[in-house]
Amino acid sequence: MAIKLIVGLANPGAEYAATRHNAGAWYIDLLAERLRAPLREEPKFFGYTSRITLEGEDVRLLVPTTFMNLSGKAVGAMASFYRIQPDEILVAHDELDLPPGVAKFKLGGGHGGHNGLKDIISKLGNNPNFHRLRVGIGHPGDKNKVVGFVLGKPPVSEQKLIDEAIDEAARCTELWFKEGLAKATSRLHTFKAQ
């Protein structure tokens, strides 16, 4: 299946723009910039959207303007309107279980406590079988500190690693369309920013 919708999860507003929880949106912003496809607000899809063409395939980009725990509202609206199936969707999100500087593709699975993923699974009819781009942000080491951690800004040294991983993920997304998921996954999964 070709990917028809790429989503970057985030919380809306300037106060959240630089927080770890918005790593998915950073990836979409970079992809839109690389492909010269500026995002614009589209209220009927509850988010910022753009359309790109990769290897002849029409692909929609989406950054929801809902809060993270309501991300499924935007994803569900766009998927329904364009008749996009779950396995044609790639969702980029921050990942506590990967260190900064690492990003990985994954198909399906649970939500791992991520409220954005949880809502998307629910709004896609409890179907978790969409692709994910997991952008490593690291873990605070104590589960009671997770909320403050994801809503905090990474130090400059970590931000640099996250940005490098996102840059590689954007390149590997283009590679996915050119040479397939296996090749893109192999390249991305051997990358670690230093």
Swiss-Prot record:
* Residues annotated as catalytic: H21
Q: Where in the cell is it found?
A: Cytoplasm
Q: Where is this site: Stabilizes the basic form of H active site to accept a proton?
A: D94
Keyword Cytoplasm listed? The answer is yes
| SUPFAM superfamilies linked | Peptidyl-tRNA hydrolase-like
Q: Which reaction does it catalyse?
A: an N-acyl-L-alpha-aminoacyl-tRNA + H2O = an N-acyl-L-amino acid + a tRNA + H(+)
Which terms are listed as keywords in the entry? Answer: Cytoplasm, Hydrolase, RNA-binding, tRNA-binding
Lineage top rank: taxon: Bacteria
Q: What GO molecular-function term can you cite, just one? A: peptidyl-tRNA hydrolase activity
Q: Which InterPro entries match?
A: Pept_tRNA_hydro (IPR001328), Pept_tRNA_hydro_CS (IPR018171), Pept_tRNA_hydro_sf (IPR036416)
Q: Where does tRNA bind?
A: Y16, F67, N69, N115
Q: Choose any GO biological process term that the UniProt entry carries and state it.
A: protein quality control for misfolded or incompletely synthesized proteins
What are its E.C. numbers?
3.1.1.29
- First and last residue of the signal peptide: none
- Spell out the residues of the site Discriminates between blocked and unblocked aminoacyl-tRNA: N11
Q: Report the Gene3D superfamilies cross-referenced here.
A: Peptidyl-tRNA hydrolase
One GO cellular-component annotation of the UniProt record comes to: cytoplasm
Using the UniProt record, name the top-level EC class of this enzyme in a single word: hydrolase
Q: Which residues form a coiled coil?
A: none
Known function: Hydrolyzes ribosome-free peptidyl-tRNAs (with 1 or more amino acids incorporated), which drop off the ribosome during protein synthesis, or as a result of ribosome stalling.
What is stated as this protein's family in its record? Answer: Belongs to the PTH family.
* Subunit structure, as described in the record: Monomer.
Name of this protein: Peptidyl-tRNA hydrolase
Name the species this protein comes from: Salmonella paratyphi B (strain ATCC BAA-1250 / SPB7)
State the gene name recorded for this protein.
pth
